[in-house]
Amino acid sequence: NFYDTTDGGQVNGADAVRQPGSTLKPLLYAMCFDEGLLTPKTIMTDVMVNYNGYAPENYDKKFNGYVTVESALEHSLNIPAVKGLQMLGHEQMIQKMSNINFRQIQKDRRKLGLSLILGGCGTTLDELTGLFSSFANDGNYFAPSFIQSDTIFNTSKVISPASNYMINEILSK
């Protein structure tokens, strides 16, 4: 609150809840790889779809036809991501995110659906930082820490090393 005199109108940007846009797509695809639902070379269709009134679109409003998962992630295509979430089940994605301390996701879990993967949820910079650190740590999640310590707390396996490798290969192109 800008007019709150107790904090001088300051906002902690790292703790502010914001919609994450497409930043959850790497986690989704890694989870699909782990479940054996998809591989980077799996062909998906990027065509108009409608899920009971929910019709996701790509940012450019175009459809690309047949695309690989790798290409879908490289180009941040929305429709293949929604299809991937439908295959995986949004409940499984919500549970994984809850397990690594996505607090707003835990709070809103009953309201979330397929739009979750396109940013239809709330996350914080701290939560996303923790998630993306797992891609640099062989799929292991480490809770963000802002002080140097000899002890590592709150570690858990987010994705397998194999899926982690595939996602890192795609994201590094």
Label each residue range with its predicted role.
Residues N1-D7, Q95-K96, I100:
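A short, well-structured edge-of-sheet supersecondary motif
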Residues G8-A14, G65-Y66, E74-A81, R110-I117, ...:
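Flexible glycine/proline-enriched surface loops and loop-helix/loop-strand junctions
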Residues V17-M44, A72, L131-F135, I167:
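Active-site SXXK
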Residues T23-L24, T39, M44, N64-V67, ...:
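Extracytoplasmic
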Residues M31, E35-P40, Y51, L88, ...:
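A generic secondary-structure signal for well-formed alpha-helical elements
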Residues L38-M93, I152-K173:
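Conserved catalytic neighborhood of penicillin-recognizing serine enzymes
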